[in-house]
């Protein structure tokens, strides 16, 4: 049994239990995409809507649902707290796969879209959807998703490319007509070209013929047909094409017209000689030979199977007996998430330079695309990096157990020979520092988006500190470790330096100082003391950088003299009554003064010198979401620089003496062993 538990980040753990009607273990399904727009109303855990939602999801994942048809709708409650939902399984999957996929998606819905009233989750085998509005028999184009094969059509001849595009378009549109006319609203097609082409289209069966056809045609137009494969999802329909068989051809054979065999010429018929006839005497002799040869081979194979089955069972039992602790971080227990190196190598085109996404703290990160079309981020650890076996194991163990929309999701790992690789979900919009520290990119993140990012980071850290099964201290929160999803949703990444706390543990000491210059709290950088308040300090620095578009590590001028780093500069502006001078000029006047001022105030509370003065992440989330909460007066920040270089506060004086080897001169993460 794998020790990678899936546990909900919501406090109401009974929710997961109430949605587990199946006795058999549910297999994992790859999450392709989700839609939970922030503009839609949310609900609270004590609301009637949440009670109705639990009833609805239990109904959709019950044994009585219509898995045989692959489609089920349900409604729970009365207006204004009514919840309407449905699931749609791919038309070729079995009832068992459909049932397991729906059960899996029901369990995951609150991981991806906590407290959202309108949700769509996309998996390869099924789609789950619910809303506070009536979504039945209605076409919806909101919440779309597109996945494209990374390879372009391999032809330098533009005419051939256009011919392929026309073939895909025309065949998909013909399939759309067939699907719209069918009762199941599902159709597949296989076309024999120089290379086979496989296509699949599907609508929710509750749509009319016209609505289904219109939806499929719109989805086909939404795809880039210059790739060798792609798919487009709407909540009401989806279409896909590939150059390999991605569906069960046996299950869909009735919907695909069989290809007639080519007519053979008389000369070709002569070459198709019938098999030799065997006399009764020869038949008996041949049968004896077959028995003598085949039976020992089968017996030998059965012995091998029995041996390895017993060995695997023994290994699995050992894993079950060893509970997960910070010390018991044997990476071999993650077998269920292990990827084959050749598969990763193929997905990244042998780690091609064109697929390189960037340079991480311990190695390079590449984009990979598996044959199923799933895009991933592959972190290939450098053989000369500072991350050893412990850091690698730590990142796998920590991240694989974390499920939250504001955390990057670990899909698996590879540990072969001297290769150590982590496979994450692909986050398309790079990292936060790529936008806020670049003068040409800053304008793409207006204040509304940045305010949402601040809230997302806060919720992600709160989950690490309080709402996950274990208390996780990240220890390297910085702009480069905040990735941005499709909707600029913030996702915390890079857990190679994270630490797990025990149930009653609140702080710890270490001789191994890790982190990034400018983000480390004073007590951690000086004495190796770290706690949840260490991450709070880093969060405060992050907020100031997001608001200003400036790096904390730079030195800033004020009234013609040095004002120190960004934290000190902000404190001086705050003390002078002019905090809004910190605001990124790219906002112009398009921001809410009260929101920006409140965020600056909260950030200064986070970077106070004394750890006990800093708020907890739960208090910070409340401060960000409830404007009526009064804020305390911030005290002087840690690492405060006075106007004269001879008047630096004591901590800074000592830092210059004791931590020359601790702080990196750039933004790279550092790992150094220093005495306390």
UniProtKB/Swiss-Prot annotation:
Keywords: ATP-binding, Glycoprotein, Kinase, Membrane, Nucleotide-binding, Phosphoprotein, Receptor, Repeat, Serine/threonine-protein kinase, Signal, Transferase, Transmembrane, Transmembrane helix. The modification Phosphothreonine is found at residue 516. SMART domains: S_TKc (SM00220). Belongs to the protein kinase superfamily. Ser/Thr protein kinase family. CRK subfamily. This is Cysteine-rich receptor-like protein kinase 4. The chain crosses the membrane at residues 288-308. ATP binds at residues 357-365, 379. The active site is at residue 476. Coiled coil: none annotated. The gene is CRK4. Its EC number is 2.7.11.-. Residues 309-676 are cytoplasmic. One of its GO terms (cellular component) is membrane. Pfam families: PK_Tyr_Ser-Thr, Stress-antifung. CDD domains: Gnk2-like, STKc_IRAK. Glycans are attached at residues 33, 46, 64, 152, 181, 243, 248, 286. The modification Phosphotyrosine is found at residues 424, 524. One of its GO terms (molecular function) is protein serine/threonine kinase activity. The keyword ATP-binding applies. It is found in: Membrane.
């Amino acid at each position: 049994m794998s020790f990678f538990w899936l546990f909900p980040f919501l406090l109401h753990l009974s929710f997961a239990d109430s949605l587990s009607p199946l006795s058999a273990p549910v297999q994992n399904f790859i999450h392709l995409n989700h839609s939970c727009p922030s503009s839609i109303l949310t609900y609270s855990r004590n609301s009637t809507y949440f009670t109705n939602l639990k009833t609805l999801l239990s109904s959709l994942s019950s044994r009585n649902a219509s898995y045989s048809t692959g489609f089920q709708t349900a409604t729970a409650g009365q207006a204004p707290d009514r919840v309407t939902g449905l699931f749609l399984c791919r038309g070729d999957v079995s009832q068992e796969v459909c049932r397991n996929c729906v059960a899996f998606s029901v369990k995951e819905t609150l991981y991806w879209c906590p407290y959202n009233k309108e949700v769509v989750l996309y998996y390869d085998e099924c789609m789950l959807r619910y809303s506070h509005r009536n979504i039945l028999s209605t076409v919806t184009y909101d919440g779309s998703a597109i996945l494209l094969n990374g390879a372009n059509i391999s032809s330098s001849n533009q005419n051939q490319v256009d011919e392929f595009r026309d073939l895909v378009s025309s065949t998909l549109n013909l399939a759309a007509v067939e699907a719209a006319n069918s009762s199941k609203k599902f159709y597949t097609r296989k076309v024999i070209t120089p290379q086979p082409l496989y296509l699949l289209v599907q609508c929710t069966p509750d749509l009319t013929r016209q609505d289904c056809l219109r939806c499929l045609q719109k989805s086909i137009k939404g795809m880039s047909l210059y790739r060798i494969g792609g798919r487009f999802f709407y909540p009401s329909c989806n279409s896909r094409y590939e150059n390999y068989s991605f569906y069960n051809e046996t299950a869909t054979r009735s919907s695909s017209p069989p290809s007639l065999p080519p007519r053979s010429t008389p000369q070709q018929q002569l070459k198709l000689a019938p098999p030799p006839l065997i006399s009764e005497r020869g038949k008996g002799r041949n049968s004896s030979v077959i028995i003598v040869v085949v039976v020992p081979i089968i017996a030998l194979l059965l012995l091998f199977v029995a041996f390895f089955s017993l060995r695997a069972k023994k290994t699995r039992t050992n894993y079950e007996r060893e509970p997960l602790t910070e010390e018991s971080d044997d990476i071999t227990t993650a077998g269920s998430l292990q990827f084959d190196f050749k598969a990763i190598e193929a997905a990244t085109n042998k780690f091609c330079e064109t697929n390189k996404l960037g340079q991480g703290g311990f190695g390079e990160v590449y984009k990979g695309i598996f044959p199923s079309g799933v895009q991933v981020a592959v972190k290939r650890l450098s053989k000369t990096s500072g991350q050893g076996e412990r850091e690698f194991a730590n990142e796998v163990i920590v991240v694989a157990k974390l499920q939250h929309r504001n955390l990057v999701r670990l899909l698996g790992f590879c540990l072969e020979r001297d290769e150590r690789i982590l496979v994450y979900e692909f986050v398309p919009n790079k990292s936060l520092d790529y936008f806020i520290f670049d003068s040409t990119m800053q304008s793409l993140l207006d204040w509304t988006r940045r305010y949402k990012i601040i809230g997302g980071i806060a919720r992600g850290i709160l989950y690490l500190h309080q709402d996950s099964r274990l208390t996780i201290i990240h220890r390297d929160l910085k702009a480069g470790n905040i990735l941005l999803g499709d909707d600029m949703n913030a996702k915390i990444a890079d857990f190679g330096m994270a630490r797990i706390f025990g149930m009653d543990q609140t702080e710890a000491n270490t001789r191994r100082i890790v982190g990034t210059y400018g983000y480390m709290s004073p007590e951690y950088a000086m004495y190796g003391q770290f706690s949840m308040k260490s991450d709070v300090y880093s969060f405060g620095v992050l907020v100031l950088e997001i608001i200003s578009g400036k790096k904390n590590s730079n030195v800033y001028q004020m009234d013609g003299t040095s004002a120190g780093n960004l934290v000190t500069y902000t404190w001086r502006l705050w003390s002078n009554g002019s905090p809004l001078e910190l605001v990124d000029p790219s906002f112009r006047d398009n921001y809410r003064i009260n929101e920006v001022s409140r965020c600056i105030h909260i950030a200064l509370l986070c970077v106070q010198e004394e750890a006990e003065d800093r708020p907890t992440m739960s208090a910070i989330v409340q401060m960000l979401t409830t404007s009526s909460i009064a804020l305390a007066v911030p005290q002087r920040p840690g690492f405060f620089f006075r106007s004269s270089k001879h008047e630096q506060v004591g901590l800074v004086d000592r830092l210059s003496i004791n931590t020359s080897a601790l702080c990196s001169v750039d933004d790279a993460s550092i790992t150094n062993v220093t005495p306390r």
